[in-house]
Amino acid sequence: MVDKSQETTHFGFQTVAKEQKADMVAHVFHSVASKYDVMNDLMSFGIHRLWKRFTIDCSGVRRGQTVLDLAGGTGDLTAKFSRLVGETGKVVLADINESMLKMGREKLRNIGVIGNVEYVQANAEALPFPDNTFDCITISFGLRNVTDKDKALRSMYRVLKPGGRLLVLEFSKPIIEPLSKAYDAYSFHVLPRIGSLVANDADSYRYLAESIRMHPDQDTLKAMMQDAGFESVDYYNLTAGVVALHRGYKF
């Protein structure tokens, strides 16, 4: 019998007990929640908005559908999906982190996004929804923080309706070698400094850089989605592979 307490995983470059990672990730996002949107704009030079727009365009979401914005944070995707599904549809903004969920709720209500949005604190590995609930699931810059990614992908598959699709927007592996080296230098030297100056938290942004490097590359994540049951899985490299959008279907 396997001793669960001895199972390990990665927290950035650290090896930690699996049971500890969720709390460590929670601490990171409790710390950065209030500066999350500002830091996203600064870190990506605003390009994250284009990546998210492309995700929306690839989602195929239309009026009357039900969408799960998983690890939805401050609600960038939820705001757009809310308009697409209209009054007859529904968007569930789910996040494991209470601070991020609170920021998302406040932000969306302040811009008038109400009525067809629900907020749920949920763990991606054990989603609290019935089978075959959602037409579309998105997880944007969240999967790399999940302890058991395979379990989370199976959970997402379960709650998708037949014909539904999952879109995973996540940092990935640059496909141009000179860019990869420059990206490493930026991630490990510049990002922590920005985090220190703006959010007074260099360590959380050092974890961000490390977690990106430990995340599966494009083809590995594609295979993981297929192993979870998804079909017709493909991916798009964005900004030369700095970010990738994976899409898979449940048939």
From Swiss-Prot:
Keywords for the protein's UniProt record, in alphabetical order: Cytoplasm, Menaquinone biosynthesis, Methyltransferase, S-adenosyl-L-methionine, Transferase, Ubiquinone biosynthesis
Pathway(s): Quinol/quinone metabolism; menaquinone biosynthesis; menaquinol from 1,4-dihydroxy-2-naphthoate: step 2/2; Cofactor biosynthesis; ubiquinone biosynthesis
Positions that bind S-adenosyl-L-methionine: 74, 95, 123-124, 140
Stored Gene3D superfamilies: Vaccinia Virus protein VP39
EC category: transferase
Disulphide connectivity of cysteines: none
One GO molecular-function entry: 2-methoxy-6-polyprenyl-1,4-benzoquinol methyltransferase activity
InterPro entries reported in the protein's UniProt record: SAM-dependent_MTases_sf, UbiE/COQ5_MeTrFase, UbiE/COQ5_MeTrFase_CS
GO biological process: aerobic respiration; menaquinone biosynthetic process; methylation; ubiquinone biosynthetic process
EC number of the protein: 2.1.1.163, 2.1.1.201
Annotated compartments: Cytoplasm
Highest taxon, organism lineage: Bacteria
Name of a matching Pfam family: Ubie_methyltran
GO cellular component, one term: cytoplasm
Catalytically driven reaction(s): a 2-demethylmenaquinol + S-adenosyl-L-methionine = a menaquinol + S-adenosyl-L-homocysteine + H(+); a 2-methoxy-6-(all-trans-polyprenyl)benzene-1,4-diol + S-adenosyl-L-methionine = a 5-methoxy-2-methyl-3-(all-trans-polyprenyl)benzene-1,4-diol + S-adenosyl-L-homocysteine + H(+)
HAMAP family the record matches: MenG_UbiE_methyltr
Family according to the record: Belongs to the class I-like SAM-binding methyltransferase superfamily. MenG/UbiE family.
Function in brief: Methyltransferase required for the conversion of demethylmenaquinol (DMKH2) to menaquinol (MKH2) and the conversion of 2-polyprenyl-6-methoxy-1,4-benzoquinol (DDMQH2) to 2-polyprenyl-3-methyl-6-methoxy-1,4-benzoquinol (DMQH2). In vitro, can use demethylphylloquinol, an intermediate in the biosynthesis of phylloquinone (vitamin K1) in plants and cyanobacteria.
Subunit structure: Component of the Ubi complex metabolon, which regroups five ubiquinone biosynthesis proteins (UbiE, UbiF, UbiG, UbiH and UbiI) and two accessory factors (UbiK and the lipid-binding protein UbiJ).
Name of protein: Ubiquinone/menaquinone biosynthesis C-methyltransferase UbiE
Gene name tied to this protein: ubiE
